[in-house]
Amino acid sequence: MNAWRLDTQEQTVIISSNGGIPFIAYWDVKLTSKEDLAQLLDSFPQDFSGGVMDKAEYINFCPTSGDGFLGQPGIILHDENGIDILPNFKFIDAKKEGGMVFESRDEYNGLSIFHKISIHGEVFKFQTTLQSKKPINVGGLSAP
């Protein structure tokens, strides 16, 4: 599992990805610079399910029906004929650009989604950008 950390003077955000769109694994008081992110991530998520077969999961920045999310999707797309597009994004890259930019792609549907996190004092600003190789209709796109 990949992990990246962003810090302000008072707080730390740890972003992680297990192969799909990244998610917030930790957002709380500032961690020490010596904190072992791998060990911290291994302690999450805790099993609150009472031993059932379903495991606890993080909700990523933009949950989709295409990746098996059963709740309200973070993105609703249709092709030019009104047919649902069920994206299944895979994590591609993370870059430091005025904060962090995370890129995920759905090659099959020709989609790319970028999640940018920038720091302004003690405020984390989240921005989502969707790109498509072909015309699509966006019925909804939620930013984290």
Indicate where each model-derived feature is located:
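Acidic (Asp/Glu-rich), glycine- and aromatic
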Residues: 3-7, 16-20, 30, 109-111, ...
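Substrate/cofactor-recognition hotspot
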Residues: 23
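Acidic, aromatic-enriched beta-alpha/helix-loop junctions
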Residues: 27-52
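N-terminal trafficking/processing presequences and adjacent post-cleavage segments
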Residues: 45-48, 56-65
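Extended, loop-rich substrate-binding clefts of extracytoplasmic carbohydrate-active enzymes
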Residues: 60-123
